[in-house]
Amino acid sequence: MHFLAFLLCLIPLALCIIEPRDIDGPTSHEAPTDLPIDWHILSQAAGMAHEPYCLFGDIGDRVGDAEVLWSKGHGVVIQRVKIFHSKSLGVTVSFEGTTASLLSILHDVNAALIDPPKEVAPAYCEGVKLFAGFSNAYMELRDEVYEQIVKFQKQFNDKRVTTTGHSLGAAMAVLAAMDLNKRLDDGIYRSFAFGMPRTGNGAFANDVDKKIGGRFFYIVNGRDWVPRVLPRELGFQHPSGQIWINPPSTTHWKYYPGQENHYGANSEDPILTFEDYHGIYSHICLGYGPGKCPASVGTVYLP
């Protein structure tokens, strides 16, 4: 918990070196709807999003309908990543959120908007800018993750590929989804980003909508502050696909269509604590400390 408090203190420093600009994208005023996806699928994705936080146990562990197939990293030099085969979501890659590692924290505060690295540039339209630290974190794992995904697709004869993650891992999940959607013959199947910070500019948000819209969802728990950073006034913009759990850590969830929906999570001020950040998403408690290891699916009672 202390390292996240430290991170929260560093964010104002990062903001000081970024030039304010006009809001770079639309604000949706569409009314919320029921979920466009079965909540059991969200629960399965949340369980796999939590599993990289687990330090012990690994290959062969079961998380709901999925089995851990491969793991790399310890959250110190690179973010931990795990690959599963899930009966409902196919070959699934899950990225770890922020850890106590200085390098992990530096990924979070390296908040410049940069051009996509040349290796992933073909996945994006012109004008896209990415959060530098999140992009760097993904690039450190990109090639090996791709090799493992292709191997497991063949092993299980399963073309479906899903990405997921929490916090920093959620940002990596959407970057992976865009990259893999270009690299894989059949694109991606689904992408779920829990507690995702804003990861790029308006062109990025539009590109996500265009290329993986309807397959990408980001989930906000209550007044979690992480999805509110960095501010839109600094050129950052969420894509469409918001599912808002409100009140937090309950089964009261709705889908908020369009980008930065006026009636969604932006309608309430963030709470600068970690209760909602480390909250319960679709019956799964996510994050270091409160989350169960190994991860489980659908085991937390919700009001």
Curated annotation (Swiss-Prot):
Originating species: Malassezia restricta (strain ATCC 96810 / NBRC 103918 / CBS 7877) (Seborrheic dermatitis infection agent)
Principal location class: secreted
Principal EC category: hydrolase
A GO biological process held by the record: lipid catabolic process
Reaction equations catalysed: a monoacylglycerol + H2O = glycerol + a fatty acid + H(+); a diacylglycerol + H2O = a monoacylglycerol + a fatty acid + H(+)
Protein name: Secreted mono- and diacylglycerol lipase LIP4
Family designation: Belongs to the AB hydrolase superfamily. Lipase family. Class 3 subfamily.
Cystine crosslinks: C54-C293
Subcellular location: Secreted
Keywords: Disulfide bond, Hydrolase, Lipid degradation, Lipid metabolism, Metal-binding, Secreted, Signal
One Gene Ontology term, aspect cellular component: extracellular region
Molecular function terms from GO: diacylglycerol lipase activity; metal ion binding; monoacylglycerol lipase activity; triacylglycerol lipase activity
Signal peptide: 1-16
Catalytic site: S167 (nucleophile), D224
Highest taxon of the lineage: Eukaryota
Pfam families in the cross-refs: Lipase_3 (PF01764)
Enzyme nomenclature, EC number: 3.1.1.-
Primary role: Secreted lipase involved in Dandruff and seborrheic dermatitis (D/SD) probably via lipase-mediated breakdown of sebaceous lipids and release of irritating free fatty acids. Shows activity against monoglyceride and diglyceride substrates. Due to an absence of fatty acid synthase genes in Malassezia species, secretory lipases are essential for the yeast to generate free fatty acids from degradation of sebum and assimilate them as lipid sources for growth. Plays an essential role at the pathogen-host interface during disease progression.
